[in-house]
Amino acid sequence: SVIVRTIYYHDENNRLMKEISVGKYGNSIGSKTYEYDILDRKIKITTYDNNGLMEETIKFVYDNKNSKIYKNYMDSSQEIFLKKETLFNGEGNPYIEAIIDGKDRVLEKNVFFYDTLGRTSQVKQYDMFRHNEFDNVQLPIKVSIYEY
């Protein structure tokens, strides 16, 4: 069995700043660091491998109305290989999530639906790269329905 222990470090404002995961004999499996803006919004997550070398960086960009978040996923050479653009509804819940590759092609779109209590009721996943069009209607490749 694999035993992994993760140690979390927080600052004086209780924000997660760093996490380190260690394995069976206390050897590092990897770590992550977190950065925040002056509004306490997460703006950067950097992932390191077991040797302390940077593997991936995720940078967060927020619009002024907090209705949209962009996440840019960068490899160790700081090249963007994936982007996620998330639009939020009036209640602050994700409404549409677009997944975009490093060449700015939309690969996937996820549409979120909520019940009257604000709980996720359905998520429709669309493959935007390989269109499944029938009579000019985009068909979802996966529908997840949540029952409470």
Locate predicted features.
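Buried hydrophobic residues that stabilize the cores of well-folded domains
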Residues: 1-148
